[in-house]
């Protein structure tokens, strides 16, 4: 039996509905795959008739192909990944490749063949391919039943212009849209459980995510910053995070805690955080702010308090977890691989100078009056200028030539 080149066929769903913009989404996904599969023996990646095909080097083992497919499935924009072989547009070769693919698919009691002919210059139509190749595969596996509805295994055959692709093992991807196809957002990122999940959900919708972490430094240690860095390294494996700004926030919290009404501290902290995030967002050309808030989960996340924090900024604020309960968020965190990191205790600004009885139904007028006692605009500029950027692997992100600090320093000089 001949040796055939191994491939991973990448199927997508939403991208296929994009009409005239479809090619842009396909190319964005292709570029993201190229960047994140550099550790695997990939020869090239091509667009073929509504799919992306990842071609692997000659001699690539089955296990390596499966590892590559597992990496692909976690890239936003991927609906399904199929492991298989490239062969000639020849029924004998399609049969041989099908036998190989079935042999690597584990145990199954029934199967069917599903062929798709994308070029009519091949004389055998899809139904005939199903019948001919299906009959031959049935002879090769006489103990296995042919079952047209809900079989254990489906052997797919894609006949394109100059080749055929045959596969049997398919695994679901995470779906969504490729990162970089939906603009840029600024995501508040703590070392806790919720915010990394919120960031991932927005990245899965195609946004380039830039994190901003408010550290309790110098009033606390920098332990939370190391945890956030670990979280970012998990998220960067799939290109979901481009950069994290670390903002030393502790001294400003202390100023608020010393002078503001105790019950309003948390809201004033968050309003200042939002303003700083928005200031950095303008520099990064980000179009929205993202938080990990879930309605009613803690005191700051009631409707009145959410309204009071939203009032501080002009950018839209996205809350991907707003309707999720804690168990759902934890389960998603475990699947992402961030949960073990987020479960570690570290002092941060979320626990610093917390009041005993925080306001749960803030009056917006009272909040604005309390905030007016502080030089908020000055603080926003100081905090944004002090923000420390840390970059991660995100092929869709193009950093500006001048840093935020340099740009703000130049403006101050003017």
Language-model regions, residue ranges each:
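RNA-binding accessory domains that recognize and position tRNA/RNA substrates
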Residues: 1-186, 196-242, 359, 364, ...
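Structural beta-sheet core signal
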Residues: 187, 211-213, 246, 291, ...
């Amino acid at each position: 039996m001949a040796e055939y080149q191994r491939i991973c066929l990448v199927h997508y769903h939403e991208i296929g509905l994009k009409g005239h913009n479809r090619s842009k989404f396909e190319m964005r996904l292709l570029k993201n795959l190229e960047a994140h599969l550099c550790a695997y023996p990939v020869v090239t990646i091509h667009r073929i008739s509504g799919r992306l095909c990842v071609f692997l080097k000659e001699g690539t083992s089955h296990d390596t192909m499966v590892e590559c497919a597992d990496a692909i499935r976690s890239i936003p924009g991927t609906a399904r990944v199929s492991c298989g072989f490239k062969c000639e547009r020849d029924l004998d070769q399609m049969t041989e490749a099908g036998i190989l693919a079935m042999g690597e698919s584990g145990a199954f009691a029934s199967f069917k063949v599903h062929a798709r002919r994308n070029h009519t210059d091949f004389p055998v139509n899809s139904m005939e391919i199903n019948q001919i190749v299906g009959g031959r595969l049935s002879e090769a596996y006489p103990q296995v039943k042919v079952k047209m509805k809900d079989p254990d295994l489906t052997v797919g055959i894609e006949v394109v212009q100059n080749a055929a692709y045959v596969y049997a093992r398919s695994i679901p991807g995470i779906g969504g849209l490729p990162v970089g196809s939906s603009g840029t957002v600024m995501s508040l990122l703590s070392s806790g459980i919720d915010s990394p999940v919120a960031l991932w959900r927005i990245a899965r919708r195609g946004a380039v995510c830039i994190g901003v972490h408010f550290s309790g430094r110098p009033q606390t240690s920098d332990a939370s910053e190391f945890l956030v860095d670990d979280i970012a390294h998990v998220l960067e494996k799939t290109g979901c995070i481009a950069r994290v700004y670390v903002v030393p926030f502790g001294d400003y919290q202390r100023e608020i805690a010393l002078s503001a009404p105790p019950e309003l501290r948390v809201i004033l902290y968050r309003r200042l955080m939002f303003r700083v995030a928005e200031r950095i967002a303008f520099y990064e050309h980000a179009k929205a702010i993202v938080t990990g808030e879930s309605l009613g989960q803690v005191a700051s996340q009631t409707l009145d308090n959410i309204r009071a924090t939203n009032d501080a900024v002009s950018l839209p604020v996205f809350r991907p977890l707003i309707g999720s309960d804690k168990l759902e968020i934890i389960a998603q965190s475990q699947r992402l691989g961030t949960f073990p990191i987020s479960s570690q205790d570290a002092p941060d600004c979320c626990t610093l100078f917390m009041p005993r009885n925080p306001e749960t139904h803030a009056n917006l007028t009272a909040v604005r009056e309390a905030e007016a006692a502080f030089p908020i605009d000055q603080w926003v500029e100081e905090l944004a200028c002090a923000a420390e950027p840390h970059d991660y692997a995100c092929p869709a992100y193009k950093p500006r030539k001048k840093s935020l600090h340099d740009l703000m320093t130049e403006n101050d000089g003017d």
